[in-house]
């Protein structure tokens, strides 16, 4: 079982948990290069902007956190394994109940169509995972997250490990020292996600 105090302390030190898909053992990760999304320069893609204009999704916050984390943990077409073990899931469900972990959800005709979840600490948001069941749902949730973080004065959106999808969303890589500097500044501020 992951202790909540240890989990929060790890995030403050630049670490985050991932479970081995084969044995579900939890490891602490601290990549040398960190993916972050520069909040001020973020722009949605044309396709996402079009979807936003059409209002295809209802965006909600924390109305089905468990549904989002389960959606993120479900096997994907490209990969049948997940780093979100039951132990990690339980820890984040507790963090949601404590008001630290949050979900941004896209709903279409009453169905959860996609979303993301992460942790809010100070002026930092640690994005953990996203999923979609309907095209563009996770990207609309991401756009809503970025706008919310900008509006509230957040300084850091940590995307953890770069991948092609994050790169399309505007993430860039920074080295560990720069990340820790940004993290320290962001943790020094008090901002509420909700």
From Swiss-Prot:
Subcellular location per the Swiss-Prot or TrEMBL entry: Cytoplasm
Reaction catalyzed: N-terminal L-lysyl-[protein] + L-leucyl-tRNA(Leu) = N-terminal L-leucyl-L-lysyl-[protein] + tRNA(Leu) + H(+); N-terminal L-arginyl-[protein] + L-leucyl-tRNA(Leu) = N-terminal L-leucyl-L-arginyl-[protein] + tRNA(Leu) + H(+); L-phenylalanyl-tRNA(Phe) + an N-terminal L-alpha-aminoacyl-[protein] = an N-terminal L-phenylalanyl-L-alpha-aminoacyl-[protein] + tRNA(Phe)
Example GO molecular function: leucyl-tRNA--protein transferase activity
This protein's UniProt keywords: Acyltransferase, Cytoplasm, Transferase
E.C. numbers: 2.3.2.6
Record SUPFAM superfamilies: Acyl-CoA N-acyltransferases (Nat)
The species this protein was found in: Chlorobium phaeobacteroides (strain DSM 266 / SMG 266 / 2430)
Main location: cytoplasm
Assigned protein family: Belongs to the L/F-transferase family.
UniProt keyword Transferase present: yes
Function recorded in the entry: Functions in the N-end rule pathway of protein degradation where it conjugates Leu, Phe and, less efficiently, Met from aminoacyl-tRNAs to the N-termini of proteins containing an N-terminal arginine or lysine.
One Pfam family per UniProt: Leu_Phe_trans
Protein's UniProt name: Leucyl/phenylalanyl-tRNA--protein transferase
GO BP annotations, alphabetical order: protein catabolic process
């Amino acid at each position: 079982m992951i202790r909540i105090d240890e989990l929060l302390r790890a995030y403050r030190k630049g670490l985050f948990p991932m479970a081995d898909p084969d044995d579900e053992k939890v490891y602490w990760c601290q990549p040398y290069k960190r993916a972050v999304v520069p909040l001020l320069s973020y722009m949605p893609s044309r396709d996402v902007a079009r979807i936003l204009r059409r209002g295809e999704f209802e965006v909600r916050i924390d109305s089905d956190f468990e549904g989002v984390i389960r959606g993120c943990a479900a096997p994907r077409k490209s990969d049948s394994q997940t780093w979100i073990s039951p132990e990690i899931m339980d820890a984040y469900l507790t963090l949601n109940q404590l008001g630290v972990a949050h979900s941004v959800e896209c709903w279409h005709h009453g169905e959860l169509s996609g979303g993301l979840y992460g942790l809010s600490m100070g002026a930092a948001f640690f994005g953990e995972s996203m999923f979609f069941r309907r095209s563009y749902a996770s990207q609309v949730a991401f756009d809503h997250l970025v706008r919310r973080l900008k509006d509230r004065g957040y300084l850091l959106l940590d995307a953890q490990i770069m991948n092609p999808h994050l790169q399309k969303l505007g993430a860039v890589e920074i080295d560990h020292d720069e990340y820790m500097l940004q993290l320290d500044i962001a943790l020094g501020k008090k901002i509420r996600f909700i």
